[in-house]
Each structure stands twice: as C-alpha cells, then as structure tokens.
Amino acid sequence: MKTTTRQTGRYGAFTPVPLPGRTWPNNIIGSAPRWLSTDLRDGNQSLATPMSPDRKLAMFELLVSMGYKEIEVGFPVASQDDFDFLRVLIEQERIPEDVRISVLVQARDELIRRTVESLEGAPRATIHLYNATSPLFRRVVFGMSRNECKDLAVQGTRLMMKYAEKTLGDCDLGFQYSPELFSDTELDFSLEVCEAVMDVWQPEPGRGIILNFPTTVERSLPNVFADQIEWLSRNLSRREHVCLSIHPHNDRGTAVASAELALLAGAERIEGCLFGNGERAGNVCLVTLGLNMFTHGVDPGIDFSDINEIRRTVERCNGLAVHPRHPYGGDLVYTSFSGSHQDAIKKGFDALEREAAHRGAAVGDLPWEMPYLPLDPEDVGRTYEAVVRINSQSGKGGVAYVMSAWHGLNLPRDLQIDFAHVVQSQADAEGGEITPDRVKRLFEREYLSSSDLPVPLASGTELVTTSLHIDGERFDVGADRADTVQAVRATLTRWGFDVRAVHRTGIAGQDRGPDADVAVYAECRVEGRVSWGVGIDRDIEAASLAAVRSAVIRARLKRLPARGGEATGIVAPLVAAGR
C-alpha cells in the first residue's frame, strides 16, 4: 500500500522571492482596505446548486446593508441567470448610489461584447477582465507562448474600451485586470503583462486602474505571497494610479494570513466571500478579515453587529451551513466547556463588573480584556448565555457562571465546589451536555428539596414559629422575628450543633422592589465535614431558616454524625430573578 510519506517526492517547495530589504514585516494594518464581495460570482459559481434569483437578491441586499461598496454581481456570459440578474439590478434601480457593481469576463471578443451589453444603463460599474498567465496554463491548457498570452490581455483591453465607448457612454466605468493564477506566474511576466495592459488603458488622475493579483490556487506560504506583492508594489509604473488588489483562495488554509500579510506589503483592496465560500477550499473570509481588524481597534467599515442574521442569510442563500468553529460566526466560537477556561472567563466578567462599578460606566464602554474571548460577543449581537456550557469537563467556574448568568444565584466559593461535583457526576452518568435549565433542576433537587416540609412562619409581624425535624423528631421554635435565627441556634445547640448565622446583605438583584427574593446559603459543619443548604424566599428570615434546616438535614441524609457539629447560615441577595 502506498503511504503519504512515500509520495512526497511528487511535490516541490514553492520558490521564494528574492527581496532584499523587504519592509512588510515591520508594517502594521492601520486602516481598512477597499473590500469587494464576490459572493454572487466566485461564491455562486462554486455551489452545487447555484442561487436562484430570489436568493441572489437576498445576498445582494445583505451585502449592501453591511456596507460593502464594491460587489461582483456575476459572470454575465457564463449563464442566462447571471445575465438576467444583472439586468434586474439595473432596470429596477436596485443599486444604491454609493455602490459599484462589478462583472467578470474572459479576454475573448464575443464574451467582452456581450458583457458590455449586459451593463447598459448601469450608473456605475467595473469590468473585470482576466486571462490565465501561469506557465502550466500557457503550456497545458492554451498552448500559448508568453507573447501570445500578453497579446490576449492587451487585445481584450482594447476590445473592452471599444465596446464600452459605444454602449456605456453615461456609465461611470472602472476597469480591473487580473493575471489569473498570478501566484504561479513568473513575477517578471506578471509585471510585463500588467504594464502592457496599462499602456492601453492609460491610467491617470480620475482614471485609475485596479490590478488584481489572485492566488487562484493557494500554493505558497503567506510570507511568499507578501513578498510577491511588495515586489510588484515596488516595480509597477504609474503606481499612484494603481489600486493593488488581491484575491486569495484558501487551498492551504492560510488565505486570511496571506491577505493580512499582503496588506502589510502594499495591497489596498481585497476580494473575498462571507464565511469563506468559493471554489474548492473557498475564498478568503471577509467576516474573519473584518473582525480581525475590529479586534485590533481598526474600523473595517463593515457592519457585523448582527452576526447571527448575517450567517442565517448566507446559509440560506448558499445552501451551506457555517461550521460551528468558524471564527466569529460559528455556534461554538464564544463557548467554553473546559473547567479552567470557564473559571477564567467567570473571573474576567467579575473583574469587568467591578471596574465598571468603580468607574461608574457601563461594561460595554470599557476596554475589552477577557480570558479566552478575543471579542465581546455582544459587539456582534451575540449574548453571553452560550459563553459557558456545561459537560463532564466543566468545573466550579463554569457551574458558578451558569448559576449567576442564567439563574441569578451568586454561590459562595465553597458551594461552587460542592455543586460542581454534583453536576460533574451527573454529566459523567448521562454523557453529553448539561443545559442551564438542567443545572438549575439539579441545584434545586440537591439543595432546595432536602427539607421534609417548607419552613412555616406565623403570619404575625412580631412572633414567628417554625419546626425542625432532626433524626425523626420534631422541634418547634417560637421567637420574635428579629431573634428567629438565634432561637434556632439555641435549639440546635441543645442537640450538639453550634449554629452561627452570618447575614451578608448586598446589592439587590434585577428586581429591586420590596418583593424581591433573597437567597440564603447555609454551611453545616459536623465534625469537620461540610453540608450545604439553600433557602430562597421573599422573607429573609424564612429563607434563612430553610437554608439552615436544609443543610442540617442534608448532613443527616449523608449519614454524617447528628451531633457535635456546627451550622453556619450565610444570607445573600438574589442577583437575578428566577426561582
């Protein structure tokens, strides 16, 4: 059987670019490039079932709403559907005044003529002309010499200008040329062809040209592509009239890196697709590129504030699901299952809230510094609810976060540890994820259902009574409301428990009214062993009694000694509604 190792001799390393004094490694990305979305052309042509007219229109409207100003709307001579869609956009005046459409065409006479006709009546448009220039395609696909290949590009440019002059006189017409398979083409030949094309177009102020350099098939390391782009930027004539554009593909999985390094090297425009759709492994992902800039403090000029709606529309139009791990947009990219990650995230949120309170500011106005989360999910329309999800790998931090964020219960640290063991045991037994609602039910079963009876309090405002059931015996306690916990302490002391109640009352939860619930956490220590109980009630005394009794009874149910211990009640406010 052949092995992959034995086949490596069939492949060779990509030849590096000799570039003394390269400057791009010392540069930074300080502003956004020009963006072009090719979802409706390169993305659409890669689909097993191309978009219907309705889906194309939905994609176009999404791109416009996000702020893309250059949109490649199709390949009009490739299909009647593409031609008809372009006509709908023009004839129904669906192209906003600040948006420029683009169409692709090969450097062939009849194709160029038909493409120009498809644009009749368009207010603004760019014709994107291309021909393959790599040695492999010249030799194997077209049987052309270098001069013949260059002449094809030159003649295509002349034909485009001739037909456009006759048909598109009122159109604000732009011109783009791409040496297809640029990254596989000799650099000197790419430059030669581009210079010949510019000699025909004659770029000047107000009449620039887009020279677009695609990694039609990604073969090299990103730094090699950056060297190619810097070499071109150095050597192109009329550079001030050239918009140096790139079109990275993702065959090696490094399209984003290639694009970012190319920006450092002088690229000024990027073509790509939302969520990386496109031929084979896809085009560069415009979402990833834009939000990478956003997280470095650079405004991408694109609205990603509702990433879920963007994703839903793209999935519906493409008929392809976005991977749950796709950067910024996948279902799981803001989620942690690991216990150590969850603990760090919880501490990060706690620190942000403390800092916000200290400054008297909203959390959303503070610099984002959060373990494991490079982007605030709320900045792209996500919530914090899915940041922490619970399974057998989760620890106290994750459990505590879910109880606080979902259910408004801020558990004392030792109770976090105690309950985490309960949740982890359940996750091990069941397998899979434990939902927040399931976590709450486990909490209620474990800590709120340990008493035989609810804690009864007399209806009077001064005198209260309650009952304790310990080891099968009932003990009634009556006292002034202010002395209820002390009375319980005295009763339990007679049975060998030293009860100490510590009330911690802080800021009320979301419900700050007089009827807001409070949560009381009681820690019962019996001969050095610990049992926890919880009480939740609008009446703080009722909650305290329920918590202490729950803790004592849980100790008994665990077969702990019934005497010779102590119980401690800790009272804290409920942080969020939801009993």
From Swiss-Prot:
Gene3D superfamilies: 3.30.160.270, Aldolase class I. Mg(2+) binds at D42, H247, H249, N283. Its EC number is 2.3.3.13. SUPFAM superfamilies: 2-isopropylmalate synthase LeuA, allosteric (dimerisation) domain, Aldolase, post-HMGL domain-like. One of its GO terms (biological process) is L-leucine biosynthetic process. CDD domains: DRE_TIM_LeuA. One of its GO terms (cellular component) is cytoplasm. Its main location: cytoplasm. Residues 450-579 are annotated as: Regulatory domain. Keywords: Amino-acid biosynthesis, Branched-chain amino acid biosynthesis, Cytoplasm, Leucine biosynthesis, Magnesium, Metal-binding, Transferase. Belongs to the alpha-IPM synthase/homocitrate synthase family. LeuA type 2 subfamily. Catalyzes the condensation of the acetyl group of acetyl-CoA with 3-methyl-2-oxobutanoate (2-ketoisovalerate) to form 3-carboxy-3-hydroxy-4-methylpentanoate (2-isopropylmalate). This is 2-isopropylmalate synthase. It comes from Streptosporangium roseum (strain ATCC 12428 / DSM 43021 / JCM 3005 / KCTC 9067 / NCIMB 10171 / NRRL 2505 / NI 9100). The gene is leuA.
